[in-house]
């Protein structure tokens, strides 16, 4: 009887142990499945959204699919004016230069160009797919969180447009505004305002014009490669002479509804939901003024004669972009009456730098890289 009872208990115990084992096994499998799903979700940041809430408790969702706007060009080509005019729109926020985005883009480009470095990264599992996902997340985070939320976000870092083809792949619905300005004016502005740019010798017009030509050639070529539906060259001179016509074309290109506020950005400087300016950006003291012609032809009479004679060879992009390399002064066109009036008021001294923006404008230089 004892033996029989012992066998029964042993059999029952074995069955219970088997059931417990099966149950635990099922639980382990279920946990692994859940964890696998979580890991898969966590490892795909490009599918996630950033959620931000403004002061009125309106929620905004941002992702790689959003219609980001990138403004760029060679420094001193009107990028700050362009972003200030867009910033004046009630549904757009650009904000100050982040400075960091063009630098990480340059690093990403360097990793791709170096065959040895790319091989090391691939061996370590840091593939192009991994890097691109990280770049997407990083760039979106910086653009979204360095200012107030808005329906449309834009970024203005001049040299980002040296990577516009790459950015167009990271953000498939993004659009690009390439600011184009007479290189002679851009270079004269760099030199006289002491805007330090890596690789540019501010003591030499010839060197700066050569570097300008190289930089704008890269940006313009990438703009053409992206295509007219994604990248719009915006001529600074035409924006200044005909702001309303130019801004209508720009807003149509961006698919954003029209607002007259884009023609009066100076009235929204420092106001909530308006135009935020940096004390240390070199263009701040200019964009506090309305659109005017004051800076259009300041370069005339300052470029050395030997450089003027060789202009077509030093900067062939001038002719390619539609400028006459031998016209001194060139004929940029006739201004709208509004611009004429604005210019008279500026020359009279009607616009002064606000007290909250004084103190740093003349001592801090732009250290953007041309690489």
UniProtKB/Swiss-Prot annotation:
<keyword id="KW-0325">Glycoprotein</keyword>
<dbReference type="GO" id="GO:0006478">
    <property type="term" value="P:peptidyl-tyrosine sulfation"/>
</dbReference>
<feature type="site" description="Transition state stabilizer">
    <location>
        <position position="156"/>
    </location>
</feature>
<feature type="transmembrane region" description="Helical; Signal-anchor for type II membrane protein">
    <location>
        <begin position="9"/>
        <end position="25"/>
    </location>
</feature>
<dbReference type="InterPro" id="IPR026634">
    <property type="entry name" value="TPST-like"/>
</dbReference>
<feature type="disulfide bond">
    <location>
        <begin position="94"/>
        <end position="154"/>
    </location>
</feature>
<dbReference type="GO" id="GO:0000139">
    <property type="term" value="C:Golgi membrane"/>
</dbReference>
<keyword id="KW-1133">Transmembrane helix</keyword>
<feature type="binding site">
    <location>
        <position position="298"/>
    </location>
    <ligand>
        <name>3'-phosphoadenylyl sulfate</name>
    </ligand>
</feature>
<feature type="binding site">
    <location>
        <position position="181"/>
    </location>
    <ligand>
        <name>3'-phosphoadenylyl sulfate</name>
    </ligand>
</feature>
<feature type="glycosylation site" description="N-linked (GlcNAc...) asparagine">
    <location>
        <position position="366"/>
    </location>
</feature>
<comment type="function">
    <text>Catalyzes the O-sulfation of tyrosine residues within acidic motifs of polypeptides, using 3'-phosphoadenylyl sulfate (PAPS) as cosubstrate.</text>
</comment>
<dbReference type="GO" id="GO:0005794">
    <property type="term" value="C:Golgi apparatus"/>
</dbReference>
<dbReference type="GO" id="GO:0008476">
    <property type="term" value="F:protein-tyrosine sulfotransferase activity"/>
</dbReference>
<feature type="glycosylation site" description="N-linked (GlcNAc...) asparagine">
    <location>
        <position position="341"/>
    </location>
</feature>
<feature type="binding site">
    <location>
        <position position="193"/>
    </location>
    <ligand>
        <name>3'-phosphoadenylyl sulfate</name>
    </ligand>
</feature>
<keyword id="KW-0812">Transmembrane</keyword>
<feature type="binding site">
    <location>
        <begin position="283"/>
        <end position="292"/>
    </location>
    <ligand>
        <name>3'-phosphoadenylyl sulfate</name>
    </ligand>
</feature>
<feature type="binding site">
    <location>
        <begin position="76"/>
        <end position="80"/>
    </location>
    <ligand>
        <name>3'-phosphoadenylyl sulfate</name>
    </ligand>
</feature>
<feature type="site" description="Transition state stabilizer">
    <location>
        <position position="283"/>
    </location>
</feature>
<feature type="active site" description="Proton donor/acceptor">
    <location>
        <position position="97"/>
    </location>
</feature>
<keyword id="KW-0735">Signal-anchor</keyword>
<comment type="similarity">
    <text>Belongs to the protein sulfotransferase family.</text>
</comment>
<feature type="region of interest" description="Interaction with peptide substrate">
    <location>
        <begin position="99"/>
        <end position="103"/>
    </location>
</feature>
<keyword id="KW-0472">Membrane</keyword>
<feature type="binding site">
    <location>
        <position position="189"/>
    </location>
    <ligand>
        <name>3'-phosphoadenylyl sulfate</name>
    </ligand>
</feature>
<feature type="topological domain" description="Lumenal">
    <location>
        <begin position="26"/>
        <end position="371"/>
    </location>
</feature>
<dbReference type="Pfam" id="PF13469">
    <property type="entry name" value="Sulfotransfer_3"/>
</dbReference>
<feature type="binding site">
    <location>
        <position position="236"/>
    </location>
    <ligand>
        <name>3'-phosphoadenylyl sulfate</name>
    </ligand>
</feature>
<feature type="disulfide bond">
    <location>
        <begin position="223"/>
        <end position="231"/>
    </location>
</feature>
<keyword id="KW-1015">Disulfide bond</keyword>
<keyword id="KW-0808">Transferase</keyword>
<protein>
    <recommendedName>
        <fullName>Protein-tyrosine sulfotransferase 2</fullName>
        <ecNumber>2.8.2.20</ecNumber>
    </recommendedName>
</protein>
<keyword id="KW-0333">Golgi apparatus</keyword>
<feature type="topological domain" description="Cytoplasmic">
    <location>
        <begin position="1"/>
        <end position="8"/>
    </location>
</feature>
<dbReference type="InterPro" id="IPR027417">
    <property type="entry name" value="P-loop_NTPase"/>
</dbReference>
């Amino acid at each position: 009887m004892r033996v029989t009872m012992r066998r029964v208990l042993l059999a029952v115990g074995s069955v219970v142990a088997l059931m417990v084992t099966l149950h635990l096994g099922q639980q382990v499998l279920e946990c692994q499945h859940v964890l696998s799903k979580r890991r898969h979700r966590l490892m795909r940041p490009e599918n996630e959204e950033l959620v931000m809430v403004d002061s009125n408790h309106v929620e905004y969702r941002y992702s790689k699919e959003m219609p980001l706007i990138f403004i760029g060009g060679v420094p001193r080509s009107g990028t700050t004016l362009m972003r200030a005019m867009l910033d004046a729109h009630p549904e757009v926020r650009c904000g100050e230069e982040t400075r960091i985005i063009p630098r990480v883009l340059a690093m990403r480009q360097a990793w791709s160009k170096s065959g040895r470095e790319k091989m090391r990264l691939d061996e370590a599992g840091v593939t192009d797919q991994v890097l691109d996902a990280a770049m997407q997340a990083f760039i979106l985070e910086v653009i979204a969180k360095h200012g107030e939320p808005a329906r449309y976000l834009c970024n203005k870092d001049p040299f980002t447009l040296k990577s516009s083809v790459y950015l167009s792949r990271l953000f498939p619905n993004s659009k690009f505004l390439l600011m184009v300005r007479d290189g002679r004016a851009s270079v004269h502005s760099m030199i006289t305002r002491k805007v330090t740019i890596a690789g540019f010798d501010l003591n030499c017009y010839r060197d700066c014009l050569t570097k300008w030509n190289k930089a704008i050639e890269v940006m313009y070529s990438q703009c053409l490669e992206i295509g007219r539906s994604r990248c719009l060259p915006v001529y600074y001179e035409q924006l200044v002479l005909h702001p309303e016509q130019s801004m209508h074309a720009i807003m149509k290109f961006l698919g954003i509804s029209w607002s007259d506020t884009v023609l009066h950005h100076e009235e929204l400087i420092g106001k909530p939901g308006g135009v935020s300016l940096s004390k240390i950006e070199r263009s701040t003291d200019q964009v506090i003024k309305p659109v005017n012609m004051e800076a259009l032809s300041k370069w005339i009479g300052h470029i050395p004669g030997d450089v003027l004679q060789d202009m077509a060879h030093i900067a062939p992009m001038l002719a390619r972009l539609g400028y006459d390399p031998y016209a001194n002064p060139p004929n940029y066109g006739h201004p709208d009456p509004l611009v004429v009036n604005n210019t008279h008021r500026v020359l009279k001294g009607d616009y002064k730098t606000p007290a909250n923006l004084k103190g740093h404008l003349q001592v801090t230089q732009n250290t953007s890289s041309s690489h």
